[in-house]
Structure formats: C-alpha cells, structure tokens
Amino acid sequence: MLFRSVITQNVDNLHERAGSTSVLHLHGELTKARSELYQDIIVPMPNQGLQPDSRCEKGSLLRPHIVWFGETVPFMSTAQNYMAHADICIVIGTSLQVYPAAGLLNHLKPQIPVWVIDPHLPQSNLPMGYQWIQSKAAEGMGKLREQLLSDAYIHFK
C-alpha cells in the first residue's frame, strides 16, 4: 500500500489548494472552528467568522481550530505514527526548533532516507545520513525530483 501524507505546522490551507489530499495540520487550521469542550467537533469556519456566542451543535462555544502556544498538540500521536511507518521523509522549510514537532524525526526508523530542503541548515535534530538541499522550497523540490529520477535511472539501468 502506498501512503503519502503531509505533516505541516502551517495553519493555512495551501497544501490542500496545491492538491495534497492527506494533510495532517499539527497546529490546526484557520479555515475551521472547533468546540471548546468536544475536540472531535470541528466545523468549517463561518464566512463571517466566529461571533462571541458561536456554538456547536452540542451547545459549547466554538473557537478557532488553532493550537495556541502552551496547548497540547492534539494530533501528535497520529504524526508520530505516520513517521514510524514512513518509507522516506522530506523536511521542508523549518528550523526544527519548535517542539514537539521538531521531535518527530526521532520516530523514523533508522534506515529511512531523509532530505532537508532549506536555505539554512537546521542546527539540531537531524538524523544520521540526512541529505541537505540548500534551497528554498520550490527550487529544492525541483532539485530533489531530479536527484531521485537520476538515482532511479542509475538503479534500474
């Protein structure tokens, strides 16, 4: 079974707008609201935004579906599971300084290939054997694509 997923700390919906269909938003989503009492109740953000008295169907107040500083990241165990079962890992545009997300690389199996795409090499949390592509995201993804296609060609030649 081939499983592809994006784990992001971004709260926008740019991954979905770019066509990604399996996106785990660690820090929530600006386009959604959730119940203050029932974390499993997540609804689209009303067009007019949340009003001070906006409530879910169970009557509790709604709030932005965002993880504020100091709050627990609700999907952390799911993200750890994704990492534990990954065949490859591509880290794009992060300093790897924000926890607990920065610790996700610790859940990879030791032999998993890891690429880091960023103009500046993160100073910590890099697994052994990682490959660094010193570029911004779009350019770096192009370089990674070329590298993978070249490696596949050499492997199957």
Language-model region placement:
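Conserved catalytic alpha/beta core of Sir2/sirtuin-type deacylases, generalized to analogous enzyme cores
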Residues: M1-K157
